[in-house]
């Protein structure tokens, strides 16, 4: 299921980033009393009562030719376009301004639900000034204090009241849901078209659960797939060309709905920092991953070229050490058949379950080969392990003291579990828990 999206919008220096950090529970946005500090959209997730949602902090929109204002406004308008609900923030201390009214005009045109938050209401005496903002036309203003955390409960109650009921997944559980991500110009749309032209049977174009996303269903060699949000990959236009301006949020939503994510990189240009950042979105969400090296036809080769490039990928994407690597040319439609076995295996392993008895045999054997660590005379005791979830496979290891389970030993156990059961293509999570 895709989570509802909440965008925080307003002019500069009204406290958007402070409220964002309050909602997500950690300091993700930079907070300074300088207009324009948050130029790009910042993404995170939040929860309130029984509702999970994604939230975006945007840069401040203002009148005039301030530095980066064109970029900031474009970013904010994209966030508004993608949001289910908008928190429109104003500042009680400065009162209603022309910039507030300009932001209001943008929000009227969006026709989205808007919750008006009046920030910096730090005491009861200031509440009377809140009513000046009724003139903006968004109903009752919610007085809040970002610095003190006051009023956030009422504000979030109003926000989640606009969330609709969760939509049912329209696809069979055996259907593999694929998303294709990568920085601009690595050939994502070309890969989509190449895949759809490779011995495929297009069943239909159906509306996805994300607003205005188009998912494409197809079959290959007896397996059903759905390519998530093919419209998003093909969308063009001066604002939408840039990953930083449009497709980051769209990619996050597509990843969220996927089983398997194809991370596309450009063989001709090599790996850059942005590739790792984009791939990190899939890893953080615990999705199965296949790394696709596209434009392989453009590389001069000898017998060692592929191995050298694979070594470089492994070095740069160490956090994706479980992912298999496919070398393809979408333009020439070559080597595409190598993709599907990797996709299928990654999907199967993402859903794999291991019997507790077999798992504990492996864990016991691992401990006998490499005894558990000690700290200040205390040894880590591992009592037993069990698998508690799939997608991704998640294991709980019951121990005498969680603090004694160092990262290095947890990694060792993960490697032993992988050696025994495979799990190619998928992350696995190991959680240490104290036995009662």
Swiss-Prot record:
Domain named EngA-type G: residues: 4-167, 176-351
Keywords carried by this UniProt record: GTP-binding, Nucleotide-binding, Repeat, Ribosome biogenesis
Binding of GTP 1, residues: 10-17, 57-61, 119-122
Residues that hold GTP 2 according to the record: 182-189, 229-233, 294-297
GO BP terms, alphabetized: ribosome biogenesis
Alphabetized InterPro entries for the sequence: G_ENGA, GTP-bd, GTPase_Der, KH_dom-like, KH_dom-like_a/b, P-loop_NTPase, Small_GTP-bd
Molecular functions (GO terms): GTP binding; ribosome binding
Domain (KH-like) ranges: 352-436
Function comment: GTPase that plays an essential role in the late steps of ribosome biogenesis.
Complex formation: Associates with the 50S ribosomal subunit.
Record-stated family: Belongs to the TRAFAC class TrmE-Era-EngA-EngB-Septin-like GTPase superfamily. EngA (Der) GTPase family.
Name this protein carries in UniProt: GTPase Der
Source species of the chain: Staphylococcus aureus (strain USA300 / TCH1516)
């Amino acid at each position: 299921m895709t989570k509802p999206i909440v965008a925080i919008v307003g002019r500069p220096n009204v406290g958007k980033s402070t409220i964002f950090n309050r909602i997500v529970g950690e300091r993700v946005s930079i907070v300074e009393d300088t207009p324009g500090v948050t130029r790009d959209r910042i993404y995170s997730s939040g929860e309130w009562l029984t509702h999970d949602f994604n939230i975006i902090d945007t840069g401040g929109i203002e009148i005039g030719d301030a530095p980066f204002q064109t970029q900031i406004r474009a970013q904010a308008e994209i966030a508004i376009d993608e949001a289910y609900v908008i928190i429109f923030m104003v500042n009680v201390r400065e009162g209603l301004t022309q910039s507030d009214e300009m932001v209001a005009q943008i929000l009227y045109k969006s026709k989205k639900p808007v919750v008006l938050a009046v920030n910096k209401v730090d005491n009861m005496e200031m509440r009377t000034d809140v009513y000046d903002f009724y003139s903006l036309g968004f109903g009752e203003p919610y007085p809040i204090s970002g610095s003190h955390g006051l009023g956030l409960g009422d504000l979030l109650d109003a926000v989640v009241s606009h969330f609709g009921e969760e939509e049912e997944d329209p696809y069979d559980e055996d259907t593999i849901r694929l998303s294709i991500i990568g920085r601009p110009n690595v050939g994502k749309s070309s890969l989509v078209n190449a895949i759809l032209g490779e011995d495929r049977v297009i069943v239909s174009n159906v509306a996805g659960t994300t607003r205005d996303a188009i998912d494409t269903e197809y079959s290959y060699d007896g397996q059903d797939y759905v390519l998530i949000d093919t419209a998003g990959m093909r969308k063009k236009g001066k604002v939408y060309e840039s990953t930083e301006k449009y497709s980051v949020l769209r990619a996050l939503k597509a990843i969220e709905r996927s089983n398997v994510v194809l991370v596309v990189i450009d063989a001709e240009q090599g790996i850059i920092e942005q590739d790792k950042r984009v791939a990190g979105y899939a890893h953080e969400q615990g999705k199965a991953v296949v790394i696709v090296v596209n434009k392989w036809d453009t590389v001069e080769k000898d017998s060692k070229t592929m191995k050298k490039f694979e070594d470089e990928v492994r070095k740069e994407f160490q956090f994706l050490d479980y992912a298999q690597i496919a070398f393809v040319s979408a333009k020439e439609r070559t080597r595409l058949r190598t993709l599907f076995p990797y996709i299928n295996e990654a999907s199967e392993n993402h859903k794999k379950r291991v019997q507790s008895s077999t798992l504990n045999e492996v864990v016991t054997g691992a401990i006998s080969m490499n005894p558990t660590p000690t700290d200040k005379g205390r040894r880590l005791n591992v009592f037993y392990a069990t698998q508690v979830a799939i997608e991704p496979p998640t294991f709980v290891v019951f121990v005498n003291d969680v603090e004694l389970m160092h990262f290095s030993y947890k990694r060792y156990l993960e490697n032993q579990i992988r050696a025994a059961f495979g799990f190619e293509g998928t992350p696995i999570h190991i959680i240490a828990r104290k036995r009662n």
